[in-house]
Curated annotation (Swiss-Prot):
SMART domains: KU (SM00131). One of its GO terms (cellular component) is nematocyst. It is found in: Secreted; Nematocyst. Its main location: secreted. This is Kunitz-type proteinase inhibitor AEPI-III. Residues 4-35 form the BPTI/Kunitz inhibitor domain. PROSITE patterns: BPTI_KUNITZ_2. GO terms for molecular function: potassium channel regulator activity; serine-type endopeptidase inhibitor activity; toxin activity. InterPro entries: Kunitz_BPTI, Kunitz_BPTI_sf. Gene3D superfamilies: Pancreatic trypsin inhibitor Kunitz domain. Belongs to the venom Kunitz-type family. Sea anemone type 2 potassium channel toxin subfamily.
């Protein structure tokens, strides 16, 4: 999926938004929290 090509950028706000990035070491998409 195209969203898996995005880097894991955490952000600087108080939001809590689940996002995904492609972890090249693990070889799969992984979830992180943006906010």
């Amino acid at each position: 999926n195209s969203f898996c090509n995005l880097p894991a950028v955490v952000g600087r706000c108080k939001g809590y938004f689940p996002r995904y990035f492609y972890n090249t070491e693990a070889g799969k998409c992984q979830r992180f929290i943006y906010g």
